[in-house]
Amino acid sequence: MSTTPARLGTRRSTMATNQSRRVAEILTARTGVPVELVLITSFGDITRAHLTQLGGTGVFVSALRDALLAGEVEFAVHSLKDLPTAPTEGIVLAAVTERDDPRDALCARDGLKFADLPPGATVGTGSPRRVAQLAALRPDLRYVPIRGNAETRLGKVASGELDAVVLAYAGLHRVGRLDDVTDVFDVDQVLPAPGQGALAVECRTADFTGPLRYLTAVDHLPTRAAVTAERVILAELEAGCAAPVGAYAEFVAEDRLRLRAAVVATDGSQAVRAEQTVTVTEFPDAVQAATALGRQLAHDMIEQGADQIVADAAAGRGES
């Protein structure tokens, strides 16, 4: 086996490098392949514009994909929730890592729970999905769009600029800030972003059929099946990762995959929620079962007007 390290492309943030380093460690432990990190700056890292103004799709992954196609790195690691659903020519999703906790977390001043925040309290989040679902629960709070890494956002609470922020629990875990969490939203309260908590490993298609086949060593099939169902919802609704769409799939038995999804108006006033379960053994494999499940649930939601809520949210991008 070659001792030349495989080059792993990653964004420069603490969260990105921590999660990429973890993937590298697992890959090396399972395959013996040494890995070195190559730090890459994405457009999403340098722009000060709010993600809803940018469309929210691909702003954190395009630079990594460019580096892949240019041969500057062998593979790249992304937060799966940032990955566009449309395929990119020449690039393949080689692996989906085992999912971390997919839930959203509240980090509030004075240790406050979400239910205990006073009316009018300011809650920072960069996600229309979170704003929509939180507003449905607590329309009396003021939701403020914010940008920046986890440390920057948490600093706005510490400084008193905001009463609370909402972030992904998995992300807080990856940067060692779980002590800041004051409340955690169960998926029955706030459905996470499709793919939240999982990491995506991409490489060039031509390499995956040959020298980089070893990347399958970090692929976790149950997670891949679950996030496939979730991402099909996004694709069928023609919604980007900045849309107010939540989805979560999980195996409720060895052969039963359940998918829950919600599309909520950005002010929380309208919502289409749906749930469906599929028996995986009725299909050739789990990913095909997940794809069929996602398509059926998306079709049911579109019949209830979910696509119109997505379109309305896109037309009023400045709302969140």
UniProtKB/Swiss-Prot annotation:
The protein's GO terms of the molecular function aspect are: hydroxymethylbilane synthase activity
Q: Which cofactor does it need?
A: dipyrromethane
Coiled-coil annotated residue ranges, if any? none
Where does it sit, as one GO cellular component term? cytoplasm
Q: Which keywords accompany this UniProt record?
A: Porphyrin biosynthesis, Transferase
Q: What does this protein do?
A: Tetrapolymerization of the monopyrrole PBG into the hydroxymethylbilane pre-uroporphyrinogen in several discrete steps.
- Give the miscellaneous note: The porphobilinogen subunits are added to the dipyrromethane group.
Protein name as catalogued:
Porphobilinogen deaminase
Q: Which organism is it from?
A: Thermobifida fusca (strain YX)
The taxonomy runs: Bacteria, Bacillati, Actinomycetota, Actinomycetes, Streptosporangiales
